[in-house]
Amino acid sequence: MLETTIRNKLAQKDILLMTHIVIGYPDLDTSFEVVRTMVEAGVDLMELQIPFSEPMADGPVILKANQDALATGITVDECFDFAEKVAAAYDIPFLFMTYYNILFKYGVEAFAERMAKCGLCGAIVPDLPPEEADDYLAAMNKHGMAPIFIYAPNTTEARMQRIAEHGKGFIYCMARKGVTGLQTDFSGQLGDHLDHCRASTQLPLALGFGVKDRADVEFIKGKADIAVVGSQAIRVLDEGGVPAVEAFIRSLR
């Protein structure tokens, strides 16, 4: 169970690292090398994004990675094969991140079933609110997968509690409104937001959107349980290749 795995890791570390890759960017072989490098550098769990043409929650860095991966002709089936390969190779939790159109076209039940067979632990689907997710929730629960839901800075406390009733594994907290990869003000206001998040759920909290260096990770310690690094890792890959990714991950804590 994902939550149990996270809590066991938190008994040994004061903050966990979750990274985000776009499957097939820049190609499948490099994607596998990035996963290997991140795991060896100490990443605790990882989001594997299935490329999509209109990734509404993602900023320019991850948007470009989605577009470039799609331009190679990558398919959803290839993404499942990749996920199965990395889940078999490395003993950390892997999650899918994608958009509902992918699940709808594949078939929600079939998608959840294949996730389980591949050894995945759960999924983040940013454009699917729990009120519209009955089929998804039923399929995820049936196959032992954790549906991860999102708290935004403007989510009311009452709504946070409703979301938490449906979520499993952890809650993904956005550090700010907007899309991924832009500048985030890691300050007292964000700390207050995380206090509200913590009060609304017993699930572990992950914080993403703008986490880029050790100072940001240090700020998150004691306020959330998981620091999520996405766009910055892709920037580092673009600028310095796979070896630079290892150095970057090791620099975060």
Swiss-Prot record:
Protein name per the record: Tryptophan synthase alpha chain
Pathway the protein contributes to: Amino-acid biosynthesis; L-tryptophan biosynthesis; L-tryptophan from chorismate: step 5/5
Origin species: Syntrophotalea carbinolica (strain DSM 2380 / NBRC 103641 / GraBd1) (Pelobacter carbinolicus)
Complex formation: Tetramer of two alpha and two beta chains.
EC number: 4.2.1.20
InterPro entries on file: Aldolase_TIM, RibuloseP-bd_barrel, Trp_synthase_alpha_AS, Trp_synthase_suA
Reactions catalysed, as given in the entry: (1S,2R)-1-C-(indol-3-yl)glycerol 3-phosphate + L-serine = D-glyceraldehyde 3-phosphate + L-tryptophan + H2O
Family according to the record: Belongs to the TrpA family.
